[in-house]
Regions:
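Mid-protein regulatory/catalytic core that forms ligand/cofactor-binding pockets
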Residues: 1-62
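Ser/Thr- (and often Asn-) enriched beta-sheet segments in non-cytosolic proteins
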Residues: 2-4, 83, 112-116, 144-146
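Generic hydrophobic, helix-prone segments enriched in Leu/Val/Ile
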Residues: 16, 79, 143-145
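Short, well-structured beta-strand segments within conserved domains
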Residues: 18-20, 101-103, 108-122
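Short, surface-exposed, polar/charged, turn-prone segments marking secondary-structure boundaries
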Residues: 46-51, 68-70, 142-146
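Extended, solvent-exposed segments with strong compositional bias
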Residues: 53-108, 124-127
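Proprotein-processing/basic-patch segments
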Residues: 118-150
Length: 150
């Protein structure tokens, strides 16, 4: 899946960080709480990291999932936040990739910021991806991307 966000950063600004927050989990038919999936994140075609989702969650209604959505289907995910700055890439405040930093993303020279989320061909756990938006899951938010600059 690829999302394109408008880039409002001027090429005269210095980008300090990019932050992203989203609710997601693995994907299988119906749901399966123990169903790992290796989900890889890219920004502007630069690979950032791979996170292994532990499962495709159901068994109870998500806090914001509509009553019309069947209980036999995926209901909620995990809220994950990552940040790219001069020190590298952090996931939930833990450094996961010190080899890519904010300058590698070339944000100032692009009209859009491209976020790609996928299961790579060589992934060990190929369990698919569920991404939740506003009014679904346990967190009432869409994908949130913010860029800090000076």
């Amino acid at each position: 899946m690829t999302y394109k966000f408008p880039n409002e950063i001027k090429n005269t600004e210095t980008v300090k960080s990019l932050n992203l927050s989203l609710e997601l989990c693995s994907e299988t038919m119906y749901y399966r709480d123990k169903y790992p999936s290796d989900i890889t994140f890219f920004v502007n075609d630069i690979e950032l990291f791979t996170w292994t989702s532990p499962g495709d969650f159901g068994g109870r209604r998500g806090k914001y999932t509509p009553k019309s959505w069947p209980l036999t289907s995926t209901q909620f995910g995990l809220l994950k936040t990552f940040k790219i700055d001069s020190k590298g890439v952090t996931l939930d405040n833990i450094l996961v990739n010190p080899n890519v930093n904010i300058n590698d993303l070339n944000i100032q020279n692009n009209n859009v910021i491209t976020l790609t989320i996928k299961i790579k061909e060589d992934a060990i756990h190929k369990g698919g991806i569920n991404i939740f938006g506003k009014n679904f899951g346990d967190y009432n938010q869409s994908i949130i991307l913010t860029v800090t600059s000076i």
